[in-house]
């Protein structure tokens, strides 16, 4: 390679300097090239992960709307009220009623929504009638009022009722006075006697009476009227069409002695049942009308004597379950009664396990020691 020495460049530089001085303008600085910029280092970028294809979303399953079955609150033929679940807004009232021969005829059971009939002792039965304030009509007289038994208290506990009675067996009184499941109203106690009256037309103890007004007053005094309980009451249906009805009746049943029967006969005019006592019409003392109900339930309940009881009292197993017969629409159906614990309400179930529905109107419940004591006729 050939090189140029500095002596040959000197004349050229001198000439350039003279030319700049003669121009009269400031010298423009020679632009200096910017230093080369290095390219940024490449940064490795992670490749995007392949996106997974979302699983297809299942179409929402339509939830069927449950069918609401109406629960009628009154008999369409007679207008008699029904103790229907969902309509109970006040505490029910239960009254123990005498069924000794000297107590005939009784008063006020024709106004009850539900009546229980069970053995007391020596073949004599006792009633427990349910009145529902705001549902059942007023009863100006109810009675004769008698004493309680343990199994009646167990039934009463399932209704959380104001429970009116006149004394009772030691076992029944002990539970009635100790449980918080009922409001106890004993006519033989000082705090209860003001709501009852003795009639001069009969001899004691078959002459003690009360009324729905007096019992409501007792409930008010105890601040025990409101009781909105969705579990109270029974399920009802409309009457079967006339073409589907029959005339089958629980014509006769007895508790101990066959010669002392009670029973019912089917009434096609009301699609209900008329009560018989020893084969003749059983009537209300005040109205003179034959006792009537829309539904009859006959349940089998095991019983046994209470050891050492000098009054011949018995115990009945009303906690648990057992067979029963239901009569309505002139037909007979096999059902099962269930009351799993003392505080639980008494319920009845069909063979398919569904809770039984009754015809709207009164219900009469009979507790027999054996269904063999029941005679059914058409």
Spans of features found by a protein language model:
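Ser/Thr-rich, Proline-interspersed low-complexity disordered segments
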Residues: 14, 24-80, 85
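C-terminal motif of bacterial Sec signal peptides marking the signal peptidase cleavage site
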Residues: 18-21
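Bacterial N-terminal signal peptides that target proteins for export
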Residues: 2-10
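Short linear sequence elements within intrinsically disordered, low-complexity coil regions
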Residues: 9, 43, 56-57, 239, ...
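A surface/extracellular/periplasmic glyco- and lipid-processing/surface-interacting theme
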Residues: 71-116, 121-378
